[in-house]
Amino acid sequence: MQLNSTEISELIKQRIAQFNVVSEAHNEGTIVSVSDGIIRVHGLAEVMQGEMIALPGNRYAIALNLERDSVGAVVMGPYADLAEGMKVKCTGRILEVPVGRGLLGRVVNTLGAPIDGKGPVDNDGFSPVEAIAPGVIERQSVDQPVQTGYKSVDAMIPIGRGQRELVIGDRQTGKTALAIDAIINQRDSGIKCVYVAIGQKASTIANVVRKLEEHGALANTIVVVATASESAALQYLAPYAGCAMGEYFRDRGEDALIVYDDLSKQAVAYRQISLLLRRPPGREAYPGDVFYLHSRLLERAARVNAEYVEAFTKGEVKGQTGSLTALPIIETQAGDVSAFVPTNVISITDGQIFLESNLFNSGIRPAVNPGISVSRVGGAAQTKIMKKLSGGIRTALAQYRELAAFSQFASDLDDATRKQLSHGQKVTELLKQKQYAPMSVAQQSLVLFAAERGFLNDVEVAKVVSFEAALVAYADREHAELLNHINQTGNFNDEIEGKLKGILETFKKTQSW
């Protein structure tokens, strides 16, 4: 069958009329070099700082260096199969992570993908990992406590909701233990917790998760993990991802606690990325913006006022303030708190808990050094009873340290000095506490009351720990109603003082100390 020219032209016209062009405009570039997780891309003229770049194989990179004729980007995930000449695309998006209550009780990676083998994560949407911190007008002063369950911290270095309290010390001084106990103590407080593990061994993190589960705290906690074997990019981004998950609760009028364990490793990961991107190194080879790295993260921990929460939730939540409390951890080298990263984070935070190797090795655990540990805003958040009873503890320890140094050279000491030394030794013993054994406000108050009002004067130093354990057990058994009242109100008046005195007097009659 032959077609004449008219039929052919009609057929072509018909085909042209039916042809449907689906146009997809995207900014495309070409990889010009790949090395150590860093790619250089030519041709992405419209890329933005921090934008996600789509790579072959459903992977992404983040644009960090925008140069005249190329873009330096860091790959999130494996990069061994990337090669020069491969095409990449702009996405027009910045990195987002899943947020919501469905993440509680789960272990996720930096990108929010589950790694605990419990199936997919339920989320209430996505949040960008980088967010601007609330402004001054949107904040409210810190006046509600976060109880860590540690006598030494809650009495001398109190932490408030919305505060940033640095935990700093050498390796193996109990920094993680203190933070984990603080999370365990929030089981019944209603405070949601986020634990961000940066650059740690997978076995260490598995142990932490197991402990949280054993003590019933995992259901209240999101664990964000970037292990030592993961890329520097994921270690650098993990704290921001965890912070976005914590902000979900803060912005909805709830309270959250986030632990960054630890920011020293994040700074090292960021230094690695910066050096590979050929950014100019500064002090200790860190880049010039390492202060901004931590300040923009820690400023997001805040207590926001009811107006902010109401505006954010579009009127769904009224009259409630929200808070995100941060416990960043920094590891020092041989107790050097004057190094670059420690001094940066000390200047950003609202106080620090300094843990000392010497104290830890001499059996004083938690190894808190009360001399240089401080809480700049937490005092306003302390409960009345703790504020009233904790004042003498810090003074007693300060006097004891001064006299202990002096008494090494003086052989004959007067009675007053001996009493102060003895009292200081007993208070030091009293502040010792086992791991995974947080104490309630009432239990702490009872123990501090005993020290403050001289009930330990006739107790031998060696028996102080057993005296405390027996006293707390006796009070829990015989006076649970009073302890519950103190836990609920936190008040201290003549009536409560009289009852506490009565408990101690009757307890001391039960056996000789």
Swiss-Prot record:
Catalytic activity: ATP + H2O + 4 H(+)(in) = ADP + phosphate + 5 H(+)(out)
UniProt KW Ion transport keyword: yes
GO MF, one example: ATP binding
Enzyme Commission number(s): 7.1.2.2
First-level EC class: translocase
Subcellular location: Cell inner membrane
UniProt-annotated binding residues for ATP: G169, D170, R171, Q172, T173, G174, K175, T176
Membrane topology: Peripheral membrane protein
Annotated GO CC locations: plasma membrane; proton-transporting ATP synthase complex
Site positions (Required for activity): S373
Keyword Ion transport included in the entry's annotation: yes
Keywords (A to Z) from UniProt: ATP synthesis, ATP-binding, Cell inner membrane, Cell membrane, CF(1), Hydrogen ion transport, Ion transport, Membrane, Nucleotide-binding, Translocase, Transport
SUPFAM superfamilies: C-terminal domain of alpha and beta subunits of F1 ATP synthase, N-terminal domain of alpha and beta subunits of F1 ATP synthase, P-loop containing nucleoside triphosphate hydrolases
Pfam families per UniProt: ATP-synt_ab (PF00006), ATP-synt_ab_C (PF00306), ATP-synt_ab_N (PF02874)
UniProt record similarity statement: Belongs to the ATPase alpha/beta chains family.
Subunit structure: F-type ATPases have 2 components, CF(1) - the catalytic core - and CF(0) - the membrane proton channel. CF(1) has five subunits: alpha(3), beta(3), gamma(1), delta(1), epsilon(1). CF(0) has three main subunits: a(1), b(2) and c(9-12). The alpha and beta chains form an alternating ring which encloses part of the gamma chain. CF(1) is attached to CF(0) by a central stalk formed by the gamma and epsilon chains, while a peripheral stalk is formed by the delta and b chains.
Annotated function: Produces ATP from ADP in the presence of a proton gradient across the membrane. The alpha chain is a regulatory subunit.
Name of the protein: ATP synthase subunit alpha
The species this protein was found in: Serratia proteamaculans (strain 568)
